[in-house]
């Protein structure tokens, strides 16, 4: 959604809905509201996920610096496989540097999940960015690891039958049925919110439209959107939550002003 400027007397006057990154670290941690995040993740990845818990890493702390709008989630897919989902909302122009090591930090921060450790199937690193990020014609990008042969470029490294069972818990009979070795490595999704300038045609488009405009069209039917209409209203906040949200919005204005000034000076 558009970042308000100091010209606005009330930073929250533009929308009746709460900004997603603030809600993500606070309201959406409530189990009653998990449907919102689950709906967004399902719309993006194309598989149904159920949140098991929020991982209490340092970056998940609710009182951390506002610029680190970041949560780590342990979730289960429809095949009962556990995955870790890292979701970041960012306004930093140096974001490529953070993205480079973020997924690795998620893994090291949460390497000891007790009985769940061996069941973690995948890490998804989801990045919602609100600034000019790289160059490209699309507004959603998907990155993943593929191992190609150096001397046989058409050859892709695959897991062996035993590795497939050991690492993924899947039994296969034929070598041709084993997955790519890249399946063991994190996948990245980048949503360049400000580059979305069209009518929402898919459930994911509806979510991105909400991220950009701060508004939820009455016709939107994406997974989780109906619950978002109910729990993300500004007028539903308590007095304490309202004060915290106002402080967050004011910090957002200041941070963007400082970043843009530094960017213009070539810093």
Regions found by a protein language model. Name each.
Residues 2-267:
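Elongated, amphipathic alpha-helical interaction scaffolds
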